[in-house]
């Protein structure tokens, strides 16, 4: 099982490039402290125009250790100070979840992210279908992962 933290950041109009630069700096700091970090531009569907900063961890302990370490890093704190003085976007999250099937094997240049809402009682049937879906998607080099929130809001 692995864990994921996702921040959804919507840029203020005309501030996309500044926001991208800041998020790239933050992502690099997170990487230095143990996260497998990727920054993605949402190009279609719900949230188009925003950025998703995704961090992946092999264990919950690794996630907590990383959160504490990058939060204390002077480079991270500097970007947060700049953000407070000159905000260029709105941050939602992090959404924190655990992967119950699959996990990214590496960062990909394109990610297709779909959200489905299901009751916990439906998870066994979903997990039964996952290998079949993964087999279908392998022919187009798409990884399949299923995550559930650790905290429901």
What does each of the following model-derived ranges do?
Residues 1-153:
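Short S/T/G/P-rich N-terminal loop/turn motif that feeds into the first structured element of a domain
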């Amino acid at each position: 099982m692995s864990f994921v933290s996702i921040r959804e950041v919507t840029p203020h109009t005309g501030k996309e490039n500044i926001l991208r630069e800041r998020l790239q700096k933050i992502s690099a700091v997170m990487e230095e402290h143990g996260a497998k970090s990727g920054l993605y531009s949402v190009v279609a569907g719900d949230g188009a125009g925003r950025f998703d900063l995704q961090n992946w961890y092999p264990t919950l302990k690794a996630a907590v250790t990383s959160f504490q370490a990058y939060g204390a890093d002077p480079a991270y704190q500097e970007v947060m100070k700049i953000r407070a003085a000159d905000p260029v976007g709105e941050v939602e999250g992090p959404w924190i979840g655990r992967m119950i099937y699959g996990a990214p094997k590496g960062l990909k240049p394109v990610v297709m992210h779909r959200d489905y809402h299901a009751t916990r009682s439906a998870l066994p049937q979903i997990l039964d279908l996952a290998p079949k879906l993964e087999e279908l998607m392998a022919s187009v080099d798409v990884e399949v992962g299923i995550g559930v929130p650790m905290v429901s809001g």
